[in-house]
Design a protein with these regions (language model features):
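A generic structural signal for residues located within well-ordered alpha-helices
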Residues: 120, 269-275, 325
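Structural motif
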Residues: 8, 72-75, 225-228, 251, ...
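Short pre-catalytic strand/loop immediately N-terminal to key active-site residues, enriched for Gly-Thr
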Residues: 261-267, 317-321
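ATP-dependent carboxylate-amine ligase
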Residues: 1-47, 56-66, 70, 88-91, ...
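Phosphate-binding loop of NTP-binding sites
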Residues: 19-25, 42, 56-63, 74-242, ...
């Protein structure tokens, strides 16, 4: 089977491309720019085209050279030349959520949903099931050291009392209600907060979407939910198909303290993620001794409090790369960093992700950073320009919000040079090279391209 991916450099789409490569399919793909993700896929045998083209697959016009299926990222605009060509030729086209949804029907699927903690919890579950001999297929929105720095692991069916079962662990993203394409046997629901308000408009609509998602569970399905979540008392958690009720986990459980001691990754939020994983394992009757051993061995994942020690101009620094881009994620990451490095100076370099998120959650960003400053979770904060997400920004909102306005608001009550606006990654790197003395912790935070900041330290 020949499959072409439009937007193959995305973290989700690339995982699906890896899956089909492992399955022996002919994979091609395109994106706007090359990246370490596209280069890794090329090394695996995928044919990569940069940028998008009006031709498909190998670029040959002959019918037998055309792909059988085109899978595209939801971020790809409708007028994309490859998509237009595929539809004109009558080639089947599926969005990434639609394509992943088809897989969920073929597997015993465990879907991790929620505003925060999806990638880490999904990764933990994938690792634990692997250690327990369940040989799962895992499609996750980050790269895992345990899976050879890959965002995909392809497993095989295993024989259990019920017969042969194939397990699939996925992230169930709520963006644009993507998760409504998925049909899992187990749903993990971490937390629910206001996010993606450009699509949902308000929290009420977000809650409705999550409730609809839980209705996708079969009669013997299992809903595992966070008892500590402030929105847990909604009707979502009255799931009673065939008399079944949710299984809750909480930081008040006795296991919390043990997990806090054995986890390699810091932060109470990661203890919560581990509790969710432990609850899944117990639902699958995996012994606790295997679960705790697997969780103790978890090394973390790419851009999730990803710690590296580096030297720049003979200055030793600790770099923490983190994907956090929502006020709550920022809060828990800064708090965890201060707990881990109580005596070091902490610099936070934050790149807001998407104008609309920054606009709708502006007050929450201000509240979070003011609290972090008051509690000395950082010593210096640099905010760069907002990462512009192509195809998802409204011009009228772009005119209303900026990083300069965010910094001005943060400095309104007290201007002490602790919070700065520096527009670009390059200028930020140049500033840091000149001012860092060595020994500092530098947190690079955001879902855009801010993770590339260290590349500019040597230029």
């Amino acid at each position: 089977m020949k499959i072409h991916f439009v937007g193959i450099g995305g973290i989700g789409v690339s995982a699906l491309a890896r899956y089909y490569l492992e399955k022996g399919c002919q994979v091609s793909g395109s994106d706007l720019v090359s990246s370490e993700i596209t280069e890794a896929l090329k090394a695996k045998g995928a044919k990569i085209f940069i940028p998008h083209r009006s031709k498909l697959g190998t670029g040959q016009a002959e019918k037998h050279k055309l792909p059988d299926l085109v899978i595209y990222s939801p971020a790809v605009p409708k007028e994309n030349p490859e998509l237009k060509k595929a539809r004109k030729l009558g080639i089947k086209c599926l969005s990434y959520p639609e394509a992943l949804g088809e897989l969920t029907k073929k597997y015993f699927t465990i879907a991790v949903s929620g505003t925060h903690g999806k990638s880490t919890t999904c990764a933990m579950i994938g690792l634990l099931l692997t250690k327990a001999g369940f040989d799962p297929t895992v499609i996750v929105g980050t790269k895992l050291k345990e899976f050879g720095d890959s965002n995909c692991r392809v497993g095989k069916p295993i024989r259990q009392a019920q017969g042969k079962i194939q397990y699939l662990v996925i992230e169930a993203d709520e963006h644009m209600a993507s998760f409504l394409n998925y049909w899992p046997k187990i749903i993990v629901l971490t937390t629910i907060e206001a996010d993606h308000l450009d699509f949902y408009k308000n929290l009420k609509n977000i809650l409705k979407a999550f409730k609809k998602f839980t209705s996708h569970l079969p009669k013997d399905g299992i809903l595992i939910a966070n008892k500590d979540d402030k929105n847990r008392d909604t009707s979502i958690f009255t799931f009673t198909k065939n008399g079944r009720v949710p299984i809750f986990y909480s930081l008040k459980q006795k296991e919390s303290e043990k997990l806090r001691k054995i986890l390699k990754i810091p932060g109470v939020h990661n203890v919560s993620n581990a509790l969710a994983t432990l609850t899944v394992a117990r639902a699958l009757e995996i012994p606790d001794r295997i679960s705790f051993k697997a969780l103790a061995e978890y090394k973390g994942s790419w851009r999730r409090f990803d710690i590296k020690r580096v030297k720049i101009n003979n200055k030793s620094l600790i770099i923490i790369n983190d994907y956090g881009h929502h006020p709550t994620q920022i809060k828990v990451t800064l708090k965890a960093a201060r707990e881990k490095f109580p005596k070091r100076k902490i610099w936070c370099i934050f790149q807001p992700h998407q104008y609309q998120r920054t606009y709708y959650l502006f007050k929450d960003f201000v509240k979070t950073f003011r609290e972090a400053k008051k509690k000395s979770w950082f010593d210096k904060l640099i905010i760069t320009d907002i990462y512009d997400v192509a195809g998802r920004e409204k011009p009228e909102i772009k005119r209303e919000v900026s990083s300069e306005k965010l910094v001005a608001e943060l400095n309104k009550k007290q201007r002490d040079n602790k919070i700065l606006y520096i527009p670009t990654i390059q200028k930020t790197a140049k500033y840091l090279i000149g001012i860092l003395k060595g020994g500092e912790v530098v947190i690079i935070m955001g879902a855009g391209d801010i993770y590339k900041l260290p590349e500019y330290f040597s230029t």
